Regions:
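Alpha/beta enzyme core
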Residues: 5-14, 39-46, 52, 58-73, ...
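Short, charged, intrinsically disordered terminal tails
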Residues: 124-140
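Hydrophobic faces of well-ordered beta-strands that scaffold small-molecule active sites
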Residues: 12, 18-23, 53-55, 75-77, ...
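Short beta-strand/loop segments at the ligand-binding rim of alpha/beta enzyme cores
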Residues: 43-54, 72, 88-103
Length: 140
């Protein structure tokens, strides 16, 4: 995350202490989008926390369930094509922040941005980094 900042990027979330991110595994374990969001909201209330909730959706059925449920502030479109992202942004219609994630590269970044999303996650920044071979020599 530090290298992203140094390179001019921004981090919209540092950890689970500043925003709840409900991923696909959480959704599956909870028994669906509505159950996962509701449990996260109940947890926040019980702990006296005022945290934003982001829900990851994998398809249009999950997107519709999230929209029907509400209670979150951001929707992450996971592995949506550019065309599907554009359609999803139209369906969301500004009611929630929208993040695109999954399979986005520096070559496709502009196309996703032009869909009108608020945030774009580019995993290649962290999982496909080319290392630089450096060494230091001690001099007496």
């Amino acid at each position: 995350r530090s290298s992203d900042l140094i390179g001019g990027g921004t981090n919209h979330r540092i950890g689970l202490f500043d925003m709840i991110l409900i991923k696909d595994n959480h959704v599956d374990f909870a028994g669906g989008i509505t159950a996962a969001i509701t449990r996260a909201k109940e947890y926040c209330k019980a702990k006296g926390k005022d945290l934003k909730i982001e829900i990851e959706v994998r398809n249009f059925d999950e997107l519709q369930e999230a929209l029907d449920c509400g209670l979150m502030q951001r929707i992450m479109l996971d592995n949506f094509s550019v065309e599907d992202t554009r359609k999803a942004v139209e369906i969301i219609a500004g009611r929630y922040e929208v993040e695109s994630s999954g399979g986005i590269t520096k070559e496709t970044l502009r196309s996703y941005a032009e869909c009108g999303v608020d945030f774009i996650s580019v995993g290649a920044l962290t999982h496909s980094v080319k290392s630089l071979d450096l060494s230091f020599k001690a001099v007496k």
